[in-house]
Amino acid sequence: MNPIKKVLGCFRKADNDYHMIEDGDRIAVGVSGGKDSSCLIHCLHLYKKFSKKNFDVIGIYVDLGFGQQHIDEVIEYFRPYDIPIYVVETQIYDILKLHLDKEDRIECSLCAKLRKGALVNAAKAHGCNKIALGHHSDDAVETLFMNMINGGRLATFKPKMLLERSGVIMIRPLVYAYEHDISRMADKLEMPLSKNACPNSGHTERQAMKDMLNSLYKDYPSSKNNFQLMLRNHKQVDIFQPENDDEEDIQERIMP
């Protein structure tokens, strides 16, 4: 199947299921220069043309200060789409270098928090009521496993959520799409992709989780689809439910 049609079909289903896009929306796409956000912009561009919904789209690229990440080609690629991409300069990397972890590496969680704050502020400054991120199905499953392994909880990110402090709604229209289909779509459209300049690139906990899951998929091919179905099957959740539901008591019981 044509990867563009496949990804766009996932996009439309996500919008139908979670009512992500409405008339009058002004949506800011968090642009990274990678395949996910670029394909998301393309899907929004097509959706605006062929759906009956009236909405505006802009792109926002938060420059973290890593350097060597050239976004100009990506901006130029989308110029015919009539979707402006704004660059927000920050000193986030300088801040991260002051808070290195025990292994002298930058902290991914702090980076994500600072980047999100810069993105939200920029989106509001440009009059946007929604922010669209390029997270896909594989990201959702990886997040689920990271939370289970490191946090002892069944949780992943939501396809749509209100950021209460800012009043901005965050949406993830590619949440049903698989990463390999997005990669095929980017290749077919010959999208210029900006290399990730993060010093931790390829050596993160998320990358380790991705590698573990890919190994699992080789041994159990059906698990990939089943994991996605699991995240949507909220009516069939069977976990322990102690009659004493005191939070502190629960934490004590799960301690080794």
Where are these regions (language model features)?
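ATP-dependent adenylation/nucleotidyltransferase module used to activate substrates
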Residues: 1-142, 150, 180-188, 253-254
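Alpha-helical structural motif
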Residues: 3, 7, 70, 178, ...
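Catalytic subdomain that performs nucleotidyl-dependent activation
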Residues: 57, 115, 138-218
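Residue-level detector of flexible, active-site-proximal loop/helix-junction positions
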Residues: 66, 92-94, 161, 177, ...
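Alpha-helix boundary/capping detector
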Residues: 70, 104, 145, 149, ...
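The feature marks non-catalytic terminal segments
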Residues: 191-256
